[in-house]
Amino acid sequence: MKAWRGVLIALSFLLLSGCLVTFKEPPPASDPAPKGLLGKWSGINAWGEPMSLELTRVGNDRYQAVTYFKAKPREREAYPFTVSHHGSRWYLSAKVPGRFGGHYTIAGFELTDKRELVVYNLDLEQINQAIQHKALDGQAFQTDDGDGVQVDSNLDKVFAYLDDPANSDVFVEAVRYQRQNSAK
């Protein structure tokens, strides 16, 4: 799992229940980020390590996350991502490196009244159950770094499943960041 840490923490808003959920296609990059998302954030990752996160706009409805451990501020990693809004939830999406299938990952997020950015991973077991019960189409995969599942359903079916309040337990809090300075 350690090899995924950089990718997953950087997108820690993207995944870290310890396993990877990927999708064949990304949500369309048609939504601008909600007010307050861009800027500098700090938090503690799943391993108790202090982290910093900077979110910036890099193009039309395209963004970049730059992450680093506070103990190693010179070791920064940048990851492009997009934002979309479906139902009552905001989503982040990013391309997964080729060694993990090269598809896309999706995570939920919210901005709280307490100036926090809360990121939700998709629970691997819940997604596997959805596939077994035919609510979603997909297949399990494994890499040297751990288990994963690739969801093959089209995005309409994916978001119908994710937006259904009955499936809210598919989202697991991955990380909670606090705003470092004023929102953009």
Question: Where in the sequence are the language-model features?
Answer:
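Bacterial N-terminal signal peptides that target proteins for export
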Residues: 1-8
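C-terminal motif of bacterial Sec signal peptides marking the signal peptidase cleavage site
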Residues: 15-18
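Calycin-type beta-barrel ligand-binding domains and close structural analogs
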Residues: 20-36, 44-51, 56-58, 62-184
